[in-house]
């Protein structure tokens, strides 16, 4: 065992995989997505982790795919034993966002996900779009991105605490049960990633002390 702490397992989702694969068999993206979803569901049903997270970095720029993406993602989630999470961001290539879009365009999709909580990008984009999440299904926890993974600057604990305060003022107490980086740290040096995680913890503690 690598840790005594609760384990989160992450997996690229069926929409993202469908958008980047060449289809030489199905001739239909919805059918391809569901075939991928069936394989992922079978594999993830055997994962003994506290949280299983599906990563989708393409749907943010393609709300027109919501119907078939939702069916495929939910099919995967139905096979998860532990807590179900879905991460959505706007992509990252060389420190730049890949997708263009707005969270409000995804609200019907987000509200129909069979998920316990969302893991969303905010730090890079800012928090002006938080108002849209007043319409989020109250049974779905909102995970707030408070660390920008496309910038080498390490946030101060005070900056992170203020981001949490903004979210609570906008959405109300208890609507943001999770905080996290916007996405993965693979583009950053280890020292920067470690510094950002330390700042995240310190910012959370500072925010909790102010409440």
Where are these regions (language model features)?
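Domain-level signal for soluble alpha/beta catalytic cores
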Residues: 1-211
């Amino acid at each position: 065992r690598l840790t005594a702490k609760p384990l989160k397992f992450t997996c690229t989702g069926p929409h993202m995989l469908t958008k980047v694969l060449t289809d030489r068999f199905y001739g239909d993206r919805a059918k391809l997505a569901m075939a991928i979803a069936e394989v992922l569901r079978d594999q993830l049903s055997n994962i003994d982790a506290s949280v299983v997270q599906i990563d989708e970095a393409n749907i943010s720029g393609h709300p027109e795919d919501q119907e078939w993406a939702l069916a495929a993602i939910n099919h995967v989630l139905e096979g998860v034993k532990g807590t179900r999470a879905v991460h959505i961001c706007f992509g990252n290539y060389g420190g730049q966002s890949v997708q263009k879009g707005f969270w409000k365009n995804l609200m019907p999709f987000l509200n129909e996900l069979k998920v316990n909580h969302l893991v969303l990008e905010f730090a890079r984009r800012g928090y002006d779009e938080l108002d849209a999440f007043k319409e989020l299904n109250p049974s779905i926890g909102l995970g707030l991105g408070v660390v920008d993974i496309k910038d080498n600057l390490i946030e101060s604990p005070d900056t992170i605490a203020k981001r949490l305060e903004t979210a609570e003022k906008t959405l109300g107490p208890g609507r943001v049960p999770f905080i996290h980086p916007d996405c993965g740290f693979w583009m950053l040096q280890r020292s920067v990633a470690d510094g950002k995680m330390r700042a995240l913890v310190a910012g959370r503690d500072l925010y909790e002390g102010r409440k």
